[in-house]
Amino acid sequence: MLGCSDSRQIISPADQTNLGQLVQRPEFVDNRPQAIISSFTKYASAEYSAYKPPKPPPDTGGGDPNPNPAHKYAYIVGISDYEGTANDLQFCDDDAQDMKSYFQSQGFTIRMDLDRNATADAVEAGLNWLVASAAPGDEIAFAYSGHGAKAQGYGSSIISTDLWYLTHGWVMQFFNAANCSKKHFTLDACQVGDFSSNCATGTMMALASANTYSYDAPDLHNGAWTYYWIDGVENHGKIYAEDAATYAEAGMKAWASLYHLRVSPNHTDKYTGKFDI
């Protein structure tokens, strides 16, 4: 299966004072027979095929039409410790803790699964918690840091600690089913661009890597994209999700351009007006 890079390329730009050393995330290694991999793949179900997005609030001319949701719920996943040792990462659990701190500061009720607790069943339970919690007028968020890979025939997937491929169609069928029209979705993982194809009305989605690698910043104990995103919202006044995503993208691209490397962070904005987190 295709995942992140199979080589841990280390970059330490002399003039890159923000991130210091950057490490390319290693490839998700899966030597199981394809039949077994297929049995460890979760894909969209017909159960959610009749979903219709809730009607968004009216456009206010550029501001956030729902700046003060009645309730806010965030489900956060960070996986550095995978089954076995071949696929372990370094800072994804730190990414999750930093995301938790930020979302808590914004008034969110948090549910979080880290490392070996983030099984496929746990992620499904967490996504169902978002669906069960959300009501019209509420806001939800999902944030993931860990391995991303391509599932044969199903495209971009995130990987649970017990090595299930959670495909973009499967994850988004839950997220899109939440009965509210203010939704924030972030992935710090490799090759997760297919998730944007499922981005529904009311959602602001930001991805660290559409079709290339993601990177870690060991000196800062973060994924590079997560570092820039947190830096934007906490230190540079990026209170709107669109601005935070743009700030993170610009930071990664500016660094990569110094070394003629290609990175592909991007965002898809289907929220009406500006998204005040």
Describe the residue ranges of each PLM region.
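Short, solvent-exposed loop/turn and secondary-structure capping segments
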Residues: 86-89, 152-156, 196-198
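Active-site-proximal beta-strand/loop segments in catalytic clefts of secreted hydrolases
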Residues: 75-80, 113-118, 143-148, 160-163, ...
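Extracytoplasmic/secreted proteins, especially bacterial periplasmic and envelope-associated proteins
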Residues: 94, 98-105, 118, 122-129, ...
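Active-site-proximal C-terminal subdomain of hydrolase catalytic domains
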Residues: 183-269, 275-276
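Sec-dependent bacterial lipoprotein signal peptides
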Residues: 1-2
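A short, glycine/acidic-enriched catalytic loop
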Residues: 122, 147-178, 239
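Surface-exposed acidic, glycine-flexible loop patches that form ligand/cofactor-binding
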Residues: 63-68, 130-138, 149-150, 174-177, ...
